[in-house]
């Protein structure tokens, strides 16, 4: 029997106009998350954003090969498997980005000479895959009880470039700043969702 | 033309650090900062209030608060590192400010000094047994750490045996070491666990719940069948009853009682007691 917490959250804010860069209001797709669904890994989570779904499993702190051990902190490994085909260069670059994020957040110095492995499997891809992978990895690390100094999440945003404005670097920078601001505002929604789903899980005990 | 760009945002440490007292019993997330009671008075509404310097230094009562699992000290605040419910225990003898800890649910065990665990012997090399305790490395157990063991009188331990012992050395930098005697040299229930019976794994939170001082589950299980049971803090339980069927029933009940409410449990026990 597995402990499952199904938590759905619908976050809608006002949508900006079509072609112009996104304003402060943003609309995120429907979220759902399930924790502790796999019996073998120490922590697991499945994260759904609209139609994109990623399954994450965390093993750790576990034994590490002598060639890979680091004397004063934990060795973090991320494995990302695409839905079809063998992992390629794009997966490797995403793995590196996720690993850098996790390393900044996980307190590796508490478990030296051990390994923490995050395995991500893409179940379906309908946009913003990297953001969904980051969210699933974070929920799986929390489920496994790996000590962390903060939580992290991912929000994807797209830049629309109009013909005339591409040439002007400053307004391009402006658009980037607007994207960053919108993503930061949206990340508060994701954190609120994390809190609600974890409270629901612990409210049963 | 659209270029996707992903932004990974790290959670800031909440809007404001909350007082630990107000969060007791609630779910806390990694990254939250908690204020200890003595700091609450200093951080009044509005933060940057100037306090007049007093010439006679008021006896600042420094209360010693112990940071338990799931919490770390960062500066003069507590940083939450695991997700779970915040708990507090008042100090017994009156000194110190008590213990704060986070009650989290975990499957993976990390060795802690003084914990009693069930291990499986995996190798025998010279005078040392290697015992798998479910952590990141196997613990070492010397053959002299059994009651009445001498160099001539070696204990009868084979590869694959179950051992119930406690850790004497368990920190992040060294290989864990366990022994099967207490500080007086007596076995006190530790040592090789006998024949038959069933070993199974549960979460660490369930073990702590079952080992709590007044746990109804164990009393009810004891009334059901005569049994022998050993709890290891590493999530392993060994149980033995008269017949194999009873042993399996007990194992299933203990695994399932993590997710059952007390009413469902009483129903199942009454049904089993009838049959």
UniProtKB/Swiss-Prot annotation, chain B:
Residues that bear N-acetylalanine: 2
Subcellular location: Cytoplasm; Nucleus, Nucleolus; Nucleus
Cellular component annotations (GO), alphabetically ordered: cytoplasm; cytoplasmic exosome (RNase complex); cytosol; euchromatin; exosome (RNase complex); nuclear exosome (RNase complex); nucleolar exosome (RNase complex); nucleolus
One GO BP annotation of this record: nuclear polyadenylation-dependent rRNA catabolic process
Positions of crosslink type Glycyl lysine isopeptide (Lys-Gly) (interchain with G-Cter in SUMO2): 151
Alphabetic keyword roster: Acetylation, Cytoplasm, Disease variant, Exosome, Isopeptide bond, Neurodegeneration, Nucleus, RNA-binding, rRNA processing, Ubl conjugation
Listed Pfam families: KH_6 (PF15985), RRP40_N_mamm (PF21261), RRP40_S1 (PF21262)
An example molecular function term from Gene Ontology annotations: 3'-5'-RNA exonuclease activity
Major localisation: cytoplasm
Keyword RNA-binding found: yes
Cross-referenced InterPro entries: Exosome_RNA_bind1/RRP40/RRP4, KH_dom_type_1, KH_dom_type_1_sf, NA-bd_OB-fold, RRP40_KH-I, RRP40_N, Rrp40_S1
Record: disease: Pontocerebellar hypoplasia 1B: A severe autosomal recessive neurologic disorder characterized by a combination of cerebellar and spinal motor neuron degeneration beginning at birth. There is diffuse muscle weakness, progressive microcephaly, global developmental delay, and brainstem involvement.
Recorded family membership: Belongs to the RRP40 family.
Subunit structure: Component of the RNA exosome core complex (Exo-9), composed of EXOSC1, EXOSC2, EXOSC3, EXOSC4, EXOSC5, EXOSC6, EXOSC7, EXOSC8 and EXOSC9; within the complex interacts with EXOSC5 and EXOSC9. The catalytically inactive RNA exosome core complex (Exo-9) associates with the catalytic subunit EXOSC10/RRP6. Exo-9 may associate with DIS3 to form the nucleolar exosome complex, or DIS3L to form the cytoplasmic exosome complex. Exo-9 is formed by a hexameric base ring consisting of the heterodimers EXOSC4-EXOSC9, EXOSC5-EXOSC8 and EXOSC6-EXOSC7, and a cap ring consisting of EXOSC1, EXOSC2 and EXOSC3.
Function: Non-catalytic component of the RNA exosome complex which has 3'->5' exoribonuclease activity and participates in a multitude of cellular RNA processing and degradation events. In the nucleus, the RNA exosome complex is involved in proper maturation of stable RNA species such as rRNA, snRNA and snoRNA, in the elimination of RNA processing by-products and non-coding 'pervasive' transcripts, such as antisense RNA species and promoter-upstream transcripts (PROMPTs), and of mRNAs with processing defects, thereby limiting or excluding their export to the cytoplasm.
Name this protein carries in UniProt: Exosome complex component RRP40
Classification of source organism: Eukaryota, Metazoa, Chordata, Craniata, Vertebrata
């Amino acid at each position: 029997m597995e402990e499952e917490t199904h938590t759905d959250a619908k976050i809608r804010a006002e949508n900006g106009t079509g072609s112009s860069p996104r304003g402060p209001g943003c609309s995120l797709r429907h979220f759902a998350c399930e924790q502790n669904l796999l019996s073998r890994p120490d922590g697991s989570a499945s994260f759904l954003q609209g139609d994109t779904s990623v399954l994450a499993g965390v093993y750790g702190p576990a034994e590490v090969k002598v060639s890979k051990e680091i004397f004063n902190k934990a060795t973090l490994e991320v494995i990302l498997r695409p839905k079809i085909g063998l992992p390629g260069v794009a997966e490797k670059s995403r793995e590196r980005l996720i690993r850098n994020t996790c390393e900044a957040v996980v307190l590796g110095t508490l478990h030296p000479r051990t390994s923490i492995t995050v395995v991500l499997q893409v179940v379906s891809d309908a946009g913003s895959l990297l953001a969904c992978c980051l969210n699933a990895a974070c929920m799986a690390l929390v489920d496994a009880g790996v000590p962390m100094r903060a939580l992290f999440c991912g929000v994807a945003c797209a830049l629309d470039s109009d013909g005339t404005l591409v040439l002007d670097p400053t307004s391009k920078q402006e658009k980037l700043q607007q994207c960053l601001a919108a993503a930061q505002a949206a990340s508060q929604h994701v954190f609120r969702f994390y809190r609600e789903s974890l409270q629901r899980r612990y409210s049963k005990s | 033309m659209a270029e996707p760009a992903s932004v990974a945002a790290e959670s800031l440490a909440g809007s404001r650090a909350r007082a630990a007292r107000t969060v007791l019993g609630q779910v806390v997330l990694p990254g939250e900062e908690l204020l200890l009671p003595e700091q609450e008075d200093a951080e009044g509404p509005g933060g940057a209030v100037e306090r007049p310097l007093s010439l006679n230094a008021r006896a600042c009562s420094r209360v010693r608060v112990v940071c338990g699992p799931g919490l770390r000290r960062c500066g003069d605040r507590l940083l939450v590192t695991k997700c779970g419910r915040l708990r507090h225990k008042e100090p017994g003898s009156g000194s110190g400010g008590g213990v704060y800890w986070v009650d989290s649910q975990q499957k993976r065990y990390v060795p802690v000094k003084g914990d009693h665990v069930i291990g499986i012997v995996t190798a025998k090399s010279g005078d040392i047994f290697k015992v798998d305790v479910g952590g990141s490395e196997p613990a070492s157990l010397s053959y002299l750490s059994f009651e009445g063991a001498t160099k001539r009188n070696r204990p009868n331990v084979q590869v694959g045996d179950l051992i119930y012992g406690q850790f004497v050395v368990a920190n992040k930098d060294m290989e864990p070491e366990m022994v099967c005697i207490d500080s007086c040299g007596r076995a006190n229930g530790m040592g090789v666990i006998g024949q038959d019976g069933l070993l199974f794994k549960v979460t660490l939170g369930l073990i702590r719940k079952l080992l709590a001082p007044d746990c109804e589950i164990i009393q009810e299980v004891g009334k059901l069948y005569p049994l022998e049971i050993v709890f290891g803090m590493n999530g392993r339980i060994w149980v033995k009853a008269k017949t194999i069927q009873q042993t399996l029933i007990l194992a299933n009940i203990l695994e399932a009682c993590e997710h059952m409410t007390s009413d469902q449990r009483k129903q199942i026990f009454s049904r089993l007691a009838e049959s």
